[in-house]
Amino acid sequence: NRTGGTTPQSQAALRDYLRNGLEQLINNEDQFVIVNGDLFDSFTVDPLEVVKTARLFLRWLSKTNSRALNIVAGNHDYKPKADNLSSFHLLVHMLAFSEYENQVVVHDKELGRVCGTVWCIPHMPNQDLFNVEVAKAAEMDGKGRQLLLHCNYNNHFAQNSDHSLNLDEEQTAALLRAGWTLVFGHEHVGRTLHGGRVIIVGNPFPSSVIDCIGDVDKHCLRIQGGSPQLEHTWSAHENYIEADWKDLKIPDHYKFIRVIGEASAAESAEVIKAVSKLRQSHSAYVITNAVKIEGCDLSNELAGSIEDIKVFDVVGAIMSELTEQEQNVVKGLLQ
């Protein structure tokens, strides 16, 4: 459902590219595939996309009955007080109605074993329930085991958000003491911390320009013999480019383009026209405008990846100024 920096045609091409990338990844596996949350990037997507994704998984499952698909729920797969079915659960039902239903396992309720040495905590309805599951895992013997999580890692911007959960440093330390290796979904930019025992995989393929900035290589994670190893899936080289708005002769093999540079106020219309013309003529999936107009950034690229936007939490700021009793009153009004 990415729309920032796209046209209807490039949106369709972007969806095909992401789906084809997923199919290439799972076709390399003959036993277990795990999706660690947010297979889709919103609660509901075009039903045709759900159908295409179901067909993709069914083709893979049909090759041999030894294959198993484990799907973990992410934050986009759940909506509090939702009165309609998510695309995630629609996909799950479609797979359950197939002849391969016994090869599909859904993890959307609590801490549980996925397969082999792998366990998971799916996205939970709120931070308190998530904390309960984390505490359960911290009491277990996690030595030689991997715990999949779909949440932010130590992100204070997410501390008061139930939509996007957070694992803080104290919780991380408790899980590491228990012996776990932690594997995070949710965050788009990958990194490895704590001597390789905290692995933030990132997305295996970028879906926006934001995903390309500062993250020149993308990965998936293979867990074999109880040992997690990152495997390269995508490189910014020959795929992502930053180009000055005055020189937009860009080869077609670049699929993510960030238009940069500076312009005067009088040139602002020319900038918009140049970017629009490029979007209409180039085969790139996403083209964003990061040109600065007399010191003012006209960039719309932040809209391309909502997970990376750091918004000011008004409620959290107010709560921090109140006593505990006053906070309880406010919470009661908000419920």
Language model features with spans:
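Accessory, non-catalytic peripheral segments of nucleic-acid enzymes
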Residues: 216-335
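Conserved beta-sheet core of the metallophosphoesterase superfamily
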Residues: 159-227
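Conserved catalytic scaffold of divalent metal-dependent phosphoesterases
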Residues: 53, 73, 77-173, 204
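Hydrophobic beta-strand segments of well-ordered beta-sheets in folded domains
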Residues: 31-33, 68-70, 116-118, 144-147, ...
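Active-site environment of divalent metal-dependent phosphoester hydrolases
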Residues: 2-4, 41-44, 71-83, 125-128, ...
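N-terminal active-site segment of His-dependent metallophosphoesterases
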Residues: 1-56, 65-66, 132-144
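Short, conserved loop/helix-junction motifs that constitute active-site signature segments
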Residues: 60-65, 137-142, 172-178, 251
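Divalent metal-coordination and catalytic microenvironments
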Residues: 33, 38, 53, 74, ...
